[in-house]
């Protein structure tokens, strides 16, 4: 009550904002006579003048009145359209990073030109985001005339465009495109192997058309790029024979050389679920691979071109030694199906990763399938929040104002209409059954048809629209059906839906973005006349005038019949969608009417109010075909809609809280990746990684601030020799010195490592080696990031169960995903260091060839799919079900899910590094 009183005295916030904007409108209007005096060239020259003033430090806000006045004058000359005062207000709202709610027919497309022009002055690029390719192309061509007149370039970003066309589109001052394409381009730019392959510039300013559709209806749906890596099924089958030719070692060698009961080629650590090749095993494996023709004679497994073979060999060894049929998996219908070790149930659709599933398939002789992998993913919520400035416009945003403010920080400003609205919104009519409802709809349509009044019938599904079309066919009522599939044809039909006696059936979203003009739209026909080379200018003018006169007659005829009549066949769960349908009628002060016909069988009524309304109907003994038409029922339906909207908002907000965790990690990984791409020499980065890894290794064996007696020098020398190929006489150095600091030993190791590294670089040259290092780093980041995405997905699947243990699932997810991310960075660091340090080089050509192979292997992805599907619970799995991964990130996820920790401190780390858990990932725990 007090709030209502204050609003009456001071006005609502919306009214106060509009009042402020009207002051600026007065300034713009005062400038109009001045700019009318300028020639076309002088008007065009204002753009460059604005650019220089902005470069000199003048803000866009200071330039706004003049820039808007220039844009309006250019529109009068080029488009023959003058911006209304309310459109100037809309332009200011868009420039202030807000959402402009403008009724259908109030000219949103023209309004956007004001804010687009002003922000394009900066030269940083403006993106205008639409819901489909047709609207992007239409608006770019339509408004492009205005921008080109003012000296600005315009690009269109469409799917299936060539790479150079995309780059040109993004380098234009203004770029039109769809939300999907902007999002996918962002993901693709973060998968390139050369900075010149990127298409997007830094994200500066975006205006999102139909902002409610893109930022709310599609907010739960992530964009996903998935694909199949290079087909290596033959390699898995050839590798499958190798484990049978190798001997298994019994017992693990200890630091003092004891512990081995029977020597062999590989050791199986059943506790850590890992397999390791011994030194003898490496030599034997190289011999076998050479005989199979997989590596050259005398070549090492660690040669650059053979690095990926190690991965396949270990997968085959694990498949044979650790995974047993009818225990870990079963074979059904030519497929390997995983068995859940805790429940014993079959996990149909799930696959191990890292090539393990394929190795088991090869072992069992079933068809080896290629694996689909999520390569990159982002939600619209997180993509659009990356823009420096973001604004939007729609006909219906006020009902979702809280969500726009809460999630995107965007305030909704309702722009007044240019002329008062004359549409009559009639009371809903509620029938007992669907049949009675459709009979009433057909009666209403026939009545309008006979009076010459055009009708637009809105349905919630394609099925309903086709059923209704069948009823109208039976009644011999001519009509058009739109199902939101053919956007271009759809726009033409919608544009003519205002002609007398027109009946148009459309699903709610069909034809959105196209106005329904009473009497039909003559612009297209006028365009054909203008383009006819056989007509003189006088003939063209006469024919166009004749068209306009005919249109005026039809326009008056339709107005007299009551304007466009909207028939809703069902209430949507969102009031916003209902308002969009209603908003089709009564554009720019035209007359119009709307009515919804409901039945107790409708989902919304059935769930929320059906029983209550049915009881009223039965008490009143209402005859068949007689509707209820009462304000109390309509209000209870709106109350039900508010409940559903609230529930959907909670779901979207919760999903965003989970996705924000992945988003922060995505930003970090993409930043690291871009640093690697743009670095002149990655040698310094690799040197820092190497130093970090060696310090960690050293501190595992020689802890800081400890006595000499506590140092494990023998273990350290063994690790340096086996993992790094470094012979550093640490024990002899200690024996020969009276006293020695641990830092001196560390310096010895660093010196030996640097000398070995420099000798490799000297063999091939700094430039060649830097190229190889860059490829290895990118390969490691990309491979492990893809695994990490699957690990996060897997963690997300079961995290809600933590609630039963009185823990907050969101906090648990944050904590454990951070641990996973820390491990991911650790694994990348170790892998890059190990590969670049141990690579065996013969010539620069060999190294360059290896770099090319690495990049080709990563970029050669078959069956790449761009997904953006509707789904209910959150993230749509790329595969039928999320893949349990066996890589490092997944090993950690499995541990986390099982409640952490399962690995003993002295057990080998599940990441496969060969170190003890306490000396590897155990430190992170």
Curated annotation (Swiss-Prot):
Membrane topology designation: Peripheral membrane protein
Matching Gene3D superfamilies: Helical scaffold and wing domains of SecA, P-loop containing nucleotide triphosphate hydrolases, SecA, preprotein cross-linking domain
InterPro entries: Helicase_ATP-bd, Helicase_C-like, P-loop_NTPase, SEC_C_motif, SecA, SecA_CS, SecA_DEAD, SecA_motor_DEAD
Enzyme Commission number, as recorded: 7.4.2.8
Cofactor note: May bind 1 zinc ion per subunit.
SMART domains registered for this protein in UniProt: SecA_DEAD, SecA_PP_bind
Ion transport in keyword set: no
GO CC annotations on file: cell envelope Sec protein transport complex; cytosol; plasma membrane
Residues holding ATP: 87, 105-109, 515
Protein name: Protein translocase subunit SecA
């Amino acid at each position: 009550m007090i709030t209502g009183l204050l609003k009456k005295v001071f006005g609502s916030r919306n009214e106060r904002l509009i009042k402020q904007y009207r002051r600026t409108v007065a300034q713009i209007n005062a400038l109009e006579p001045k700019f009318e005096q300028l020639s076309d060239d002088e008007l065009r020259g204002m753009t460059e003048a604005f650019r220089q003033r902005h470069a000199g430090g003048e803000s866009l806000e200071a330039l706004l009145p003049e820039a808007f006045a220039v844009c309006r004058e250019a529109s009068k000359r080029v488009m023959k359209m003058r911006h209304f005062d309310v459109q100037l207000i809309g332009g200011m709202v868009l420039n202030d990073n807000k959402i402009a709610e403008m009724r259908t027919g109030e000219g949103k497309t023209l309004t956007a030109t004001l804010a687009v022009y002003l922000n394009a002055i900066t030269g940083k690029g403006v993106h205008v985001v639409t819901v489909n390719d047709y609207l992007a192309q239409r608006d770019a061509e339509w408004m492009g005339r205005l921008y080109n007149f003012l000296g600005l370039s315009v690009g269109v970003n469409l799917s299936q465009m060539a790479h150079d066309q995309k780059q040109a589109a993004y380098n234009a001052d203004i770029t039109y495109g769809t939300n999907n394409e902007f999002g996918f381009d962002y993901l693709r730019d973060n998968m390139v192997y050369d900075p010149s392959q990127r298409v997007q510039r830094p994200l500066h300013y975006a205006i999102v058309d139909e902002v409610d559709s893109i930022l709310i209806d599609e907010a739960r749906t992530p964009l996903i790029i998935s694909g199949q890596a290079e087909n290596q099924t033959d390699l898995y089958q050839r590798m499958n024979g190798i484990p049978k030719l190798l001997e298994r070692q019994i017992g693990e060698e200890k630091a003092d050389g004891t512990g081995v009961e029977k020597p062999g080629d590989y050791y199986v650590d059943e506790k850590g679920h890992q397999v390791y090749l011994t030194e003898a095993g490496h030599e034997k494996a190289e011999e076998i691979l050479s005989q199979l023709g997989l590596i050259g004679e005398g070549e090492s497994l660690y040669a650059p071109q053979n690095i990926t073979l190690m991965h396949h060999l270990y997968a085959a060894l694990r498949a044979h030694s650790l995974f047993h049929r009818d225990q870990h998996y079963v074979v059904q219908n030519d497929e390997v199906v995983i068995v859940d070790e805790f429940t014993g149930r079959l996990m149909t659709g799930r696959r191990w990763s890292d090539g393990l599933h394929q190795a088991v398939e090869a072992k069992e002789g079933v068809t080896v399938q290629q694996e689909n992998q999520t390569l990159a993913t982002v939600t619209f919520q997180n993509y659009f929040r990356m823009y420096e400035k973001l604004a939007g416009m729609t006909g219906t945003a006020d009902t979702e104002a809280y969500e726009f403010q809460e999630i995107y920080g965007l305030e909704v400003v309702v722009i007044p209409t240019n002329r008062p609205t004359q549409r009559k919104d009639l009371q809903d009519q509620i029938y007992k059954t669907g049949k009675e409802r459709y009979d009433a709809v057909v009666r209403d349509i026939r009545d309008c048809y006979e009076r010459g009044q055009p009708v637009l019938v809105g349905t919630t599904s394609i099925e309903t629209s086709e059923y209704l079309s069948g009823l109208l066919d039976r009644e011999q009522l001519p009509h058009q059906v739109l199902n939101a599939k053919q956007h271009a044809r759809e726009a033409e039909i919608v544009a003519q839906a205002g002609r007398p006696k027109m009946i148009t059936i459309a699903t709610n979203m069909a034809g959105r973005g196209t106005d329904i003009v009473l009497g039909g739209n003559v612009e297209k026909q006028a365009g054909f006349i203008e383009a006819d080379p056989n007509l003189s200018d006088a003939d063209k003018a006469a024919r166009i005038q004749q068209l306009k006169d005919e249109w005026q007659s039809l326009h008056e005829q339709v107005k007299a019949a009551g304007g466009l009549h909207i028939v809703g066949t069902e209430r949507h769960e969102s009031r916003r969608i209902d308002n969009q349908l209603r908003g089709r009628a009564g554009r720019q002060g035209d007359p119009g009417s709307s009515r919804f016909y409901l039945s107790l069988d409708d989902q919304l009524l059935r769930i929320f109010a059906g029983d209550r309304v049915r009881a009223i109907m039965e008490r009143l003994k209402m005859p068949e075909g007689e509707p209820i038409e009462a304000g109390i029922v309509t209000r209870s339906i709106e109350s039900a809609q508010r409940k559903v909207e609230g529930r959907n908002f909670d779901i979207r907000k919760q999903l965003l809280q989970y996705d924000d965790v992945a988003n922060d990690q995505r930003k970090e990984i993409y930043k690291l990746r871009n640093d690697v791409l743009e670095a002149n020499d990655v040698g310094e980065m690799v040197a820092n990684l190497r130093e970090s890894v060696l310090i960690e290794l050293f501190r595992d064996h020689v802890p800081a601030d400890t006595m000499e007696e506590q140092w494990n020098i023998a273990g350290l020398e063994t690790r340096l020799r086996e993992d790094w190929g470094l012979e550093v006489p640490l024990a002899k150095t200690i024996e020969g010195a009276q006293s020695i600091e641990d830092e001196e030993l560390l310096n010895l190791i660093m010196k030996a490592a640097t000398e070995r590294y420099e000798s490799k670089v000297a063999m091939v040259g700094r430039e060649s080696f830097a190229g190889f290092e860059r490829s290895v780093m990118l390969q490691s980041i990309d491979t492990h990031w893809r695994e990490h995405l699957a690990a996060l997905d897997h963690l997300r699947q079961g995290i809600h169960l933590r609630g039963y243990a009185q823990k907050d699932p969101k906090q648990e997810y944050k904590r454990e995903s951070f641990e996973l991310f820390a491990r991911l960075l650790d694994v990348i660091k170790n892998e890059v260091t190990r590969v670049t340090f141990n690579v065996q080089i013969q010539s620069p050509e060999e190294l360059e060839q290896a770099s090319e192979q690495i990049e080709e292997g990563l970029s050669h992805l078959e069956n790449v799919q761009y997904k953006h599907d509707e789904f209910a619970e959150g993230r749509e799995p790329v595969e039928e079900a999320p893949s349990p991964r066996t890589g490092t990130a997944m090993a950690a996820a499995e541990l986390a899910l099982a409640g952490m920790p399962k690995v003993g401190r002295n057990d080998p780390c599940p990441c496969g590094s060969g170190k003890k858990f306490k000396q590897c990932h155990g430190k992170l725990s």
